[in-house]
Amino acid sequence: MTQTRKLVTVYGATGNQGRSVVKSLLRAPDSFEVRAITRDPNSVAAQELSILGANLVQADGSQSNQMTEAFQGSWAVFLNINSDDPVFWDPKGPTEFDYGKRIIDSAIVAGVKTLVYSTGAACTELTKGTVSLRHLDTKNQIEMYARSTGAFENLVPIIPGYFLENFLFKQGAFIMGGFPWETDAEGYLTWKVPYWGGEEQIPFLSVADDFGDIVHGILISPSEYHLQVVQAMSEITDYQKMTEAFAKVTGKKTRFQPVLPTWKAFDASGNQGFEDVKSMFGFTQETQGHYFGREATDDQVSKNLKASAVLDYKESQQSPSLKTVRAWFAREFAA
């Protein structure tokens, strides 16, 4: 009996999360057809996805008619909105919530049955107003709106963990001690940040290696995760073990120095982006390390979903295991 392929449309397809989802689904051509929404189909990132087999559709999230047309015929949509899009910083322009609501409404009009939405925890609510993070709070508000519609047969919110890819950006390394790019006066690559909070269970995520597979796993059987917040991560570890892993694979002097006594002592140098980083540490400390909300951090669902996705690949010698922090550092930084 021939299996019917399901059409999945990815909004934010050229971003880190969306690209990972597209690439994973394209490895299972008997299960899924992939449509990638982009503002610029001629961009290098979009063309890369086209070469791999994605069908490109040009559409802008600010235009309801374009979005409805882009979603036509789709069984499922993966939605991630770039919170750092400059359009959201214009006080006269639309907010991220406006975008999210418009896109969700368009998916409903188009008859989409399944929505996997990249969300965030309700930071202000969970910290009783002590800490606010615009991007997390807004994503959570969009999630609540999607829930309130009752329009989707399967609605799966997913929260990505702490991106390992953040370590690839040299520009901001100095604010956190220099790790993994700049040595300090004593010759160490120092990771100098506040404690995470609680039991120091940091959910590191390799977006490129694992996030797409985790979403892929959800789409294999979305009803199992309907209205459940999926925690997406590659490995749970603490900062001490993280820096030790880096030292072992690179041979470089590396250490973790906690900023004490609390997250409030972290110096953001008056930079708004770094203030958000500071608030993130505030959020996790104030919630005792519960980055994903009220539930404790747990990687079992991510492990299961990763394994399901790899089994769905048409051809693969890939391990069904999630990428470890050590293996990620070895690939990206070992000589």
Curated annotation (Swiss-Prot):
Keywords: NADP, Oxidoreductase. Disulfide bonds: none annotated. Transmembrane segments: none annotated. GO terms for molecular function: oxidoreductase activity. Belongs to the NmrA-type oxidoreductase family. InterPro entries: NAD(P)-bd_dom_sf (IPR036291), NmrA-like (IPR008030), NmrA-like_oxidored (IPR051164). Its EC number is 1.-.-.-. It is an enzyme of class 1 (oxidoreductase). NADP(+) binds at residues 12-17, 39-43, 60-61, 81-88, 139, 163-166. GO terms for cellular component: nucleus. NmrA-like family domain-containing oxidoreductase; part of the gene cluster that mediates the biosynthesis of the indole diterpenes penitrems. The geranylgeranyl diphosphate (GGPP) synthase ptmG catalyzes the first step in penitrem biosynthesis via conversion of farnesyl pyrophosphate and isopentyl pyrophosphate into geranylgeranyl pyrophosphate (GGPP). Condensation of indole-3-glycerol phosphate with GGPP by the prenyl transferase ptmC then forms 3-geranylgeranylindole (3-GGI). Residues 161-206 are annotated as: Interaction with ASS1. Pathway: Secondary metabolite biosynthesis. This is NmrA-like family domain-containing oxidoreductase ptmS.
